[in-house]
Regions:
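Glycine/serine-rich phosphate-binding loop and adjoining beta1-alpha1 elements at the start
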Residues: 2-40, 71-79, 84-206
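Adenosine-phosphate binding glycine-rich loop
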Residues: 11-24, 40-44, 48, 52, ...
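Gly/Ser/Thr-rich loops at beta-strand to alpha-helix junctions
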Residues: 48-55, 75-79, 125-127, 215
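Glycine-rich phosphate/diphosphate-binding loop of Rossmann-like nucleotide-binding domains
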Residues: 49-67, 182, 186-260, 266-271
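A short helix->loop->beta-strand "cap" motif at the edges of active sites that frequently abuts
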Residues: 66-67, 92, 137-141, 165-167, ...
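ADP-ribose/adenylate-binding Rossmann-like module
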Residues: 73, 119-124, 135-151, 270, ...
Length: 414
């Protein structure tokens, strides 16, 4: 039994789903094979990913593989109500409503887990947290699962070290087919797409501060530079800071960057990146947003406590008027901007990421009997297969090593 906002929205969602399906060729090829082989026959899969059209396509592919699929979101603001209605119309149990409270969001996750899944797809680690706590009784059939994000993998590794990981988990985010493309090119494009659409402001000529120079931060900084911004990078890792410097970005601590930035984007996966001491020195009408998974990177609660007025400025933008008259603008309540006020990554990018998810779930199902409760890396053969399929779909080809070259690379003699 689904829980969605309004079934009359289904036609709009169906259009969105069909559109992205036409631009996800790697997943289409997997779907064709799954339809014949049914690798998930008799298995139930719970999927907690941003509930929009690309995720819907993944759900349909898994269903073609024989799975009983149950979909939910992974963020209170990223669910698209028309897509949730469309998936319900297509016969997939779906639990998602845009704009729910944190408690309502957790309740939707719990409803999803009542299917007692054999496999899970997690994005940020919320399902696995529930299965290791409040919903431990619903994990009795668990074979394993996949985690989509850097943040989620950090949580998984911490659980593994503490000996409380409920089941084997695949670190999908660490796959080459995922983080090289999704994190860099997907986040780079979708973050700026959301910022520009929401603010309707120029990027060129602005001083943009990017907090974090991991794969996501690299993409965000690269696209800002390409659109004519002066980019400052804030980092805690000396080598990432050096890398940013070599790419001709200015590097400085946030305490200094806060004084000169026009637009701030966090992408660290950590908490308290921009806090009250930074708000105190920011320019009037500075813009703040977050592209990390959780809403703890910009301390919006501290900003609200300092403000004498909190008011809407545009859809997706709140203004915070401070005692000295300055206004600071926060996008999407400090939640991940590219999905809370945007459409997420391009379909062609998620084609690769969700291909990794689909094949990793298949791998878990096949190897279920020999797995330990730990974090596994995606096998190289899955990564390579997806890379080659994507190249072929783009009409590209590459060279192949000869046997002599393979022997040379494997040997120690010249």
């Amino acid at each position: 039994m689904s829980i969605v906002k309004d079934m009359s929205l289904a036609p709009s969602g169906l259009q969105k789903i069909q559109w992205v399906r036409d631009f996800m060729p790697a997943l289409s090829g997997i779907e064709e094979r799954f339809r014949k082989e049914k690798p998930f026959a008799g298995l139930t899969i719970a999927v907690s990913v941003h509930l929009e059209a690309k995720t819907a396509n993944l759900g349909l592919v898994l269903r073609e593989g024989g799975a009983d699929v149950h979909l939910t979101g992974c963020n209170p603001l990223s669910t698209q109500d028309d897509v949730a209605a469309a998936m319900t119309h297509l016969g997939v149990d779906t639990y998602g409503v845009h704009g729910v409270t944190p408690q309502e969001y957790e309740d939707l996750l719990v409803e999803t887990l009542k299917c007692r899944p054999h496999l899970i797809v997690d994005d940020g680690g919320d399902l696995i947290s529930l299965l290791g706590g409040r919903c431990a009784d619903l994990g009795e059939r668990l074979i394993g699962g996949c985690e989509e994000t850097t943040t989620g993998i950090h949580r998984l590794i911490a659980r593994e070290k503490a000996g409380i990981l409920p089941c084997p988990m695949m670190a999908v985010n660490d796959a080459k087919a995922k983080h090289y493309y999704d994190n860099k090119y997907g986040t780079g494009q979708s973050t700026w797409d959301a910022i520009m659409h929401t603010t309707n402001l120029m990027v060129a000529g602005k001083t943009v501060v990017v907090a974090g120079y991991g794969w996501c931060g690299k993409g965000i900084a690269m696209r800002a530079k390409g659109m004519g911004a002066h980019v400052i990078v804030c980092e805690v890792d000396p080598f990432k800071a050096l890398e940013a410097t070599m790419e001709n970005f200015q590097v400085m601590p946030m305490d200094e960057a806060a004084k000169v930035g026009d637009l701030f984007v966090t992408a660290t996966g950590c908490k308290d990146v921009i806090v009250d001491r930074h708000f105190a020195v920011m320019k009037h009408n500075a813009i703040l947003c977050n592209s990390g998974h959780f809403d703890c990177e910009v301390d919006v609660a501290a900003l609200a406590a300092e403000a004498v007025e909190r008011f809407p400025r545009r859809e997706g933008i709140e203004g915070f008027r401070l005692k000295d008259g300055r206004i600071l603008n926060v996008l999407a309540q400090g939640r991940l901007v590219n999905l809370a006020v945007g459409n997420g990554h391009p379909a062609e990018i998620m084609d690769m990421s969700f291909a990794v998810q689909a094949l990793s779930l298949e791998w878990l199902a096949k190897h279920r009997d020999g797995l330990e409760k730990k974090v596994y890396q995606v096998p190289d053969e899955i990564d390579d297969q997806i890379g080659r399929v994507k190249l072929a779909a783009m009409g590209l080809s590459i060279d192949t090593l000869t046997q002599e070259q393979k022997d040379y690379l494997a040997g120690w003699e010249a």
